């Protein structure tokens, strides 16, 4: 990394030097059973224990010499002037789907009154309950204020924020600032916008943008994997459109970030396989985790760029051989989540047994609960750093989902 290129990520496995996390906060306590589906959760984590688990995750990374950055801190540091701060508040409000004019005015006054930038950022993440606002005089209420009185939130919380992998993705020296699948999560990308526009280290045009949050088609970071300095992998999934991938790839190739080919993986479109990294991650030079249930239906396309056009070829044959050829290794070992047992594979994939974070070649952070997959990984010679995640996993994400590398050593 240099002062000119504060982002440097050219693999999934190079020694991790710097990573972005978000410690779960009050946004988790604003989850309610009646609105879980709306907020993309299946259950409600116990915040106190989720924070302990996340703190242990962050400490495990620090113990390996990795610098841990906090999303809320970087976002707060990006609000460097009163003008930027006010612009952030206004943009946040415009995207918050606030239904009543009087309600919007009251929330703006609440946010403008928060003097500390970090406190302001944390409040925008937590959401705003209607009970926090002063009573609006009947004479000032619009029709929306009157008829939507039962829903408890004036602004929804953002409980998925601890999955920092998805709102934006670091690719080479650039960043894909994503347009996300759901309105609930798309608001999360606002923090990335301000970080990469206004932060003293990461803003000011120092980081090339290869996708824009204002695009109309959707893409998420869990579907963006950097296999090597030459090859990317992208997933066509529940959360990422093929059209978005084409836009992303044209931008990557045009900006000469160094990549020569992209492997596009098309697989089952459902919640349990929501991203490529929930079923497929790289753990060593020649080893990948994979969920066996996707192998039969998986289609892979090779994408290159020449004469200002994308050239797309559907690949046939064995996936391991395809990966080996593209990575320049003799053989690739596809390590099945849960082994060959269908029940174990389903259970451990649901608990993110395939969603590993590689912090150096052959050194992998995993949830300790996926005992069968972990034993198989260890039998293959991998060093595992096991973390507790009984509460964190309720959000349906593992160590890779909860981390966004900012700097890796080259391999």
Swiss-Prot record:
Pathway in which this enzyme or protein is active: Amino-acid degradation; L-arginine degradation via ADI pathway; carbamoyl phosphate from L-arginine: step 1/2
Family according to the record: Belongs to the arginine deiminase family.
SUPFAM superfamilies noted in UniProt: Pentein
Enzyme Commission (EC) number: 3.5.3.6
Catalytic activity: L-arginine + H2O = L-citrulline + NH4(+)
Keywords, in A-Z order: Arginine metabolism, Cytoplasm, Hydrolase
Active site per the UniProt annotation: 401 (amidino-cysteine intermediate)
Organism: Streptococcus pyogenes serotype M49 (strain NZ131)
PANTHER family: ARGININE DEIMINASE
Source taxonomy: Bacteria, Bacillati, Bacillota, Bacilli, Lactobacillales
Cross-referenced InterPro entries: Arg_deiminase (IPR003876)
Encoding gene (name): arcA
UniProt keyword Cytoplasm present: yes
Protein name from the UniProt record: Arginine deiminase
